[in-house]
């Protein structure tokens, strides 16, 4: 959006399909990056600093185990395939301060019978549905934000948990990519 527009207007060099491989450090300061461009490693210098938009580590099992609540598996994420944390690890080795590594965007997902993940950003807040733990106990307010719901799942030790919905919910609301008024037979047979 605006950041790209402003950068282009200012004549800043924008490179796509050019992942950062490493940082160039001179006298304790980051002065550029080593990037892969066109199959070759190239050095790109910086005169005023390096701005990193490194993403997270949703697809890095070791970092999930080190920093996040458990249980946690990379198979549970729909984050982009490049969300692996290498650049974060690189800057941490240089002594960069970090904060909030135990946090995540807790978008609620369910495993579909075909193995795919269904994403549920807003479905839990709809009427005629509750979320329960393995004992059938309700442990969260389904109308809270998906971030709070994710935190509540871990606070309650409710991994895994289940969404229980009645026919009124199915008649009015989608569930992931499944439209209302249609409940696949395999949902019933698979539990």
Name each region found by the language model:
Residues 9, 37-114, 118:
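Glycine-rich loop(s) and the adjacent beta-strand/alpha-helix scaffold that form part
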